[in-house]
Amino acid sequence: ATGYNEKYLPLLTEAVSAGHQIALHSASHEYSDIYRSSDAYWEDIALLKERIAPYVDAESIRYLRFPGGSTNTVSRRYGGKGLMKQLKAEVEQKGWHWVDWNVCAEDAVGGHPSAGTIYRNVVHETGQQTNCIVLMHDSATTRTTAEALPDIIRWYADNGYTFLTVAEALPLN
């Protein structure tokens, strides 16, 4: 949510230069605002693109992750039962991909888990899966995620996993 991280926006340029992929998420991450309607969601994405445009080619970004994921139920509270289905269809109509995770670090569930707990959560949730998209958070309340990351990367590498960008793993048609 860029609204909370304005001072870090210049790091986007560095991330792209290092070969990382930028995907869209949300400008505000306020469920009650963004999931009011389809128009409200796309207004939030437009604001996000406006904020990141000085640092990356925002118009070329074709991947996004819905706040709460594509099957979230919180959106029903604000925009009705069919909103997520509508938004997913609209993303696809634009020729974009929406991306969900299949491994959750559980680093934002509250209680400030330790780096060791986050590591164990990722290893446990990975199980026997061969293709993983791991959900992790980078915020003031999830500082231990960064501490856990080197061990998580090492574990995946030691277990034969290859690291790809989302675009490499899920190419657009």
Positions of PLM-derived features:
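C-terminal domain-boundary segment and adjacent tail
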Residues: 141-173
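Active-site beta->alpha N-cap acidic-glycine motif
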Residues: 1-66, 169-172
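Glycine-/small-residue-rich active-site loops that bind phosphorylated ligands and cofactors
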Residues: 3-4, 71, 141
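Alpha-helical scaffold elements lining the catalytic groove of polysaccharide deacetylases
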Residues: 30-56, 72-131, 144-147
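Structural recognition of the beta-strand scaffold that forms the well-ordered cores
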Residues: 21-26, 60-66, 97-102, 132-136, ...
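Residues within well-ordered alpha-helices
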Residues: 11, 86-87, 152
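Alpha-helical scaffold elements within enzyme catalytic domains, especially in hydrolases
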Residues: 14, 90, 154-155
